[in-house]
């Protein structure tokens, strides 16, 4: 993937997406907005918003047995500058196997893949399915 190809994808996707799936609110947020373009992180993170009725509401990410890309690594009430007050669990696409920095595009050393907004949305839907399956 070239820098031009990635820039076209980033422009098309935008930096934020909100959707609902099976009654759960989901959020996708791009990291690094407003940073120096040369060093800016541009990977996506995905979050499912939990309510008090959910089994893992208020729990640390490392105690939650659900799987998402790279593992769950976020659980908190607040998310950056987002105003919503929900317990969020989530994951990021900034791992060694992911393209997350501009220099990775031209290094020739990386077999990393850019994880798209569609990919993150699919991962979030699978995460919601795990939450629902764990209710019974």
What are the roles of these predicted feature ranges?
Residues 1-10:
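Charged, compositionally biased non-catalytic regions
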Residues 10-66:
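Amphipathic, interaction-prone secondary-structure segments
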Residues 12-22, 57-136:
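Polybasic, proline/glycine-rich intrinsically disordered low-complexity segments
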């Amino acid at each position: 993937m070239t820098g031009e190809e990635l820039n076209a994808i980033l422009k098309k996707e935008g930096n934020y997406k909100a959707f609902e799936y099976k009654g759960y609110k989901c959020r996708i947020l791009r990291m690094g907005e407003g940073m120096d373009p040369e060093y800016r992180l541009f990977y996506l993170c995905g979050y499912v918003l939990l309510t008090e009725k959910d089994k893992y509401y208020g729990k640390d990410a490392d105690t939650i047995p659900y799987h998402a890309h790279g593992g769950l690594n976020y659980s908190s009430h607040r998310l950056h500058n987002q105003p919503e007050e929900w317990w969020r669990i989530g994951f990021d696409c900034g791992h060694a196997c992911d393209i997350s920095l501009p220099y990775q595009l031209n290094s020739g050393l990386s077999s990393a893949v850019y994880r798209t907004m569609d990919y993150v949305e699919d991962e979030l839907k699978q995460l919601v399915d795990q939450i629902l399956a764990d209710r019974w």
